[in-house]
Every structure is written in C-alpha cells, then in structure tokens.
Curated annotation (Swiss-Prot):
Subunit structure: Heterodimer with ube2n.
SUPFAM superfamilies: UBC-like (SSF54495)
Protein species of origin: Dictyostelium discoideum
Residue ranges annotated for the UBC core domain, each copy included: 5-138
Cross-referenced Pfam families: UQ_con
Protein name as catalogued: Probable ubiquitin-conjugating enzyme E2 variant
A GO term from the CC aspect: ubiquitin conjugating enzyme complex
InterPro entries listed in its UniProt record: UBQ-conjugat_E2_core (IPR000608), UBQ-conjugating_enzyme/RWD (IPR016135)
Similarity field: Belongs to the ubiquitin-conjugating enzyme family.
Function: Has no ubiquitin ligase activity on its own. The ube2v/ube2n heterodimer catalyzes the synthesis of non-canonical poly-ubiquitin chains that are linked through 'Lys-63'. This type of poly-ubiquitination does not lead to protein degradation by the proteasome. Mediates transcriptional activation of target genes. Plays a role in the control of progress through the cell cycle and differentiation. Plays a role in the error-free DNA repair pathway and contributes to the survival of cells after DNA damage.
Gene: ube2v
BP GO annotations: postreplication repair; protein K63-linked ubiquitination
Alphabetic keyword roster: Ubl conjugation pathway
Taxonomic superkingdom: Eukaryota
Length: 138
C-alpha cells in the first residue's frame, strides 16, 4: 500500500477548503498563509437549525503535527460551546469522546472532523445542554 506524503494530503485539503464545497455550514483553511509546514488550521461551523446552536458561528483551531494524516489533529474550539466531547475549561475536543478521532484512519480529513462535530451538535444529549452566551470565547 502506497502512503501519500503528509504535505500532499494537506495541500489537497487546503485546495478543498478554499473551494468551499458542500452546503456552506463548515469552512476551513490555514491559520496563516505563511505556514509552510501546513500545520495550523482554523475552522468554522455554523450551528444546525432547530438546536440551541442554531445559526451561531463556532470557531476552532486544528493542529496537524508531523504524523498527520496517520494520527488525528488536535482540535480546540475558540468559541465557547457546551457539548459532551469538549473540555469546558479550554475548548479542547477529547478524542475519546468523538468517534471520528477515537477511530481515526489516515483517510479521514479536517472536513470530516468539522462535519462530525456539527452532527454532535444535533445529538439529543447535546441539544439539552445549556449553552454559553453567544460570542463567548475560551
């Protein structure tokens, strides 16, 4: 089995993020255009309709270390959010509590993580949680 080099995978993800494919509820790209290692990413999720997250904008930071895509990136919300997989002190997504991170394969991508987090917002257990005021940050 051929392994695709890390930078090729990340360049493909960058191109995909810049094209903004999908329904517009998630977006992502490099935090800095000068990041030649393609390590630090930012993402945005628009909360799902008919949930406490409805039309709120959630910002995240993702860090892809040298082992990406063989290991998942670290993911941290910068916008305060109350869902089961997010540490309420620092916004870090706990890999053990988000299936895409706990069952990571090298075929998963940043877009998949953001989509999975958006789906988590719609889960019945998370829909019941009281949310911080809009615009609050970690």
């Amino acid at each position: 089995m051929t392994t695709i080099p890390r930078n090729f995978v990340l360049l493909e993800e960058l191109e995909s993020g810049e094209k903004s494919t999908g329904d517009g509820t998630i977006s992502y790209g490099l935090e800095s255009p000068d990041d030649i290692l393609l390590s630090s990413w930012i993402g945005t999720i628009i909360g799902p309709q008919n949930t406490p997250f409805d039309n709120r904008f959630y910002s995240l930071k993702l860090y892809c270390d040298k082992d990406y895509p063989n290991k998942p990136p670290t993911v941290r919300f910068t916008t305060k959010i109350n869902i089961g997989c997010v540490n309420q002190q620092n916004g870090v997504v706990d890999p053990k509590n988000l299936p895409i991170l706990s069952n990571w394969t090298s075929k998963n991508r940043i877009q998949n993580i953001l989509s999975e987090l958006r789906r988590e917002m719609s889960s019945s257990s998370n829909k019941k949680l009281v949310q911080p005021p809009e615009g609050a940050n970690f």
